[in-house]
A protein has these predicted regions:
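Core catalytic lobe of class I
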Residues: 1-161
Length: 163
């Protein structure tokens, strides 16, 4: 995920950390994915870019690598919402100050929407301060959290009681 407002840093030999890798796992090879739950607005670019489509834009372009996939630009006409990209752009703002690797609730919320329905189980093997569990509870999912540090478990239990 891309941190829109990452913390400033003053290091002599590296840049600020403005992105972080997010890992998501499923138990099964075949799993449900509810992409409609995380669709995003197309944006204003579509109005000008799709205004005057040529005839070649209205038919599928063959893939340059022979993958069988190509693009049909006219499929974008009239759409208000589209599937998101594979980079989440989120602000780092969060009210949790009890853990060094805190992240906004919108981060686990996006994944919970994408891969689960109400009543499903969300596992967080790095519980930390419990943000994922708090969001899962709010979204009517069951949750399991694992952490090595007792103080993290205490903080997350406190947050879950308050939520």
């Amino acid at each position: 995920w891309c941190k829109k407002n990452c913390f400033p840093g003053k290091w002599p030999n590296r840049f600020r950390d403005s992105w972080e890798r997010v890992l998501q796992f499923n138990k099964e090879k075949k799993f449900d994915m509810y992409q409609e739950e995380v669709m995003v607005p197309v944006g204003d670019w579509s109005k000008s870019r799709l205004k005057n489509l040529s005839e070649t834009d209205k038919k599928r372009d063959p893939s340059k690598v022979q993958s069988g996939f190509g693009k049909n630009v006219s499929n974008w006409v009239g759409r208000d919402m589209v599937y998101p990209t594979n980079v989440l752009h989120l602000a780092t703002e969060c009210s949790n100050r009890k853990h060094s690797a805190a992240f906004p609730e919108s981060l686990p919320e996006w994944f919970i929407k994408l891969f689960t329905k109400e009543g499903d189980v969300v596992l967080d093997p790095f519980l930390g301060s419990g943000t994922t569990a708090v969001v899962a509870k709010r979204m009517q999912r069951k949750y399991v959290g694992i952490d090595l540090l007792d103080e993290n478990i205490e903080v997350s239990e406190e947050r879950l009681l308050d939520s």
